[in-house]
Design a protein with these regions (language model features):
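Charged, compositionally biased N-terminal leader segments and the immediate start
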Residues: 1-16
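Active-site core of PLP-dependent enzymes with the aminotransferase class I/II
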Residues: 216-235, 246-253
Length: 295
């Protein structure tokens, strides 16, 4: 618990004091805080009961209490998937990056891109994405897979010369990816056609801005998307392939399949869930001037 000396320190240094409050209330014409609140806050949103707040605690006591609460958690295995996979972070990364104070100290030397090796790190990241996807260029980078896919759709819209308002999205994409594309395209009045690419693409008889396919699908199935990519191109659309980068170590690259833009989350490579996900759209070189920059 907090001792009397600490309470005195709090009273002196954390205001406003009771005297300050009295002066301020007198200035605005109210007798008490309750009088002020009743005349400024609508009654219907006021709490009827007093807040149940325990006595103040020191930092150590608070940490002990939080740890005791956390021990009540039950830890289960995670089988959710859908773009989020638990992974083991290699010790070399933990030791040399996450535990290296040079990355998070308050003082940053001049030209941190050189002094801390950031430019080299980003260059290596981009080259790895290019190697895995087979694309000509890669950025470094965006946020999660859903955001990167929405950016790829935006890139396709900027490149579109058909004035189309239609976008095809495979129902095999992760649900959060589909939802984010809906949110980002709604202000532009674009029409989303969501369904099985093997059935729905052939029914579209007009130009589309782009088609978004998942490789592998959200449930893990691996299908050859080359025929669907060909159909998207016949409708003058850009083929966007949402990839599992780890799977691309064994599967055909998006470039070999004919995709125009590839996106995928790097969370698979030892990044704990809950951290920033670095995701890179890797379009053909001719689209480079229109692609989104790093975020």
């Amino acid at each position: 618990m907090i001792d009397d000396n600490s309470k005195e320190f709090i009273k002196r240094h954390i205001g406003p004091s009771e005297e300050d409050q009295s002066k301020m209330l007198q200035y605005v014409g109210y007798k008490s805080l309750e009088d002020l609140m009743s005349n400024t806050v609508p009654e219907k949103i006021l709490l009827k009961d007093d807040l149940k707040i325990d006595q103040p605690m020191s930092e150590n006591d608070a940490l002990k209490k939080l740890k005791s609460i956390s021990k009540k958690n039950k830890i289960f295995k995670n089988f959710i998937g859908m773009g989020y996979y638990n992974s083991i972070t290699p010790n070399v990364i933990l030791r040399n990056i996450l535990e290296n104070p040079g990355w998070y100290t308050s003082y940053t030397p001049y030209q941190p891109e050189v002094a801390q090796g950031r430019l080299e790190m980003l260059l290596n990241f981009q080259q790895s994405i290019i190697d895995l996807t087979g694309m000509d260029i890669a950025n470094a980078s965006l946020l999660d897979e859903a955001t990167a896919t929405a950016e790829a759709v935006g890139l396709s819209q900027r490149l579109d010369k058909t004035n189309s308002k239609k976008i095809f999205i495979s129902s095999n994409c992760n649900p959060q990816t589909i939802d984010l594309i809906k949110t980002r395209t709604n202000p532009f009045g674009l029409e989303l056609i969501i369904g099985d690419e093997k059935k729905e693409l052939s029914k579209i008889n007009e130009d589309i801005i782009c088609g978004v396919l998942s490789y592998p699908g959200t449930l893990g199935e691996i299908n050859d998307p080359s025929e669907s990519i060909s159909q998207i191109h016949k409708k003058n659309g850009k083929a966007i392939l949402v990839c599992d980068l780890l799977a691309l170590a064994r599967l055909k690259t998006p470039a070999e399949l004919g995709a125009d833009i590839a996106v995928g989350s790097a969370q698979r490579f030892g990044i704990p869930m809950g951290c920033l996900l670095y995701t890179s759209p890797s379009p053909r070189d001719r689209y480079g001037s229109r692609m989104p920059s790093s975020a």
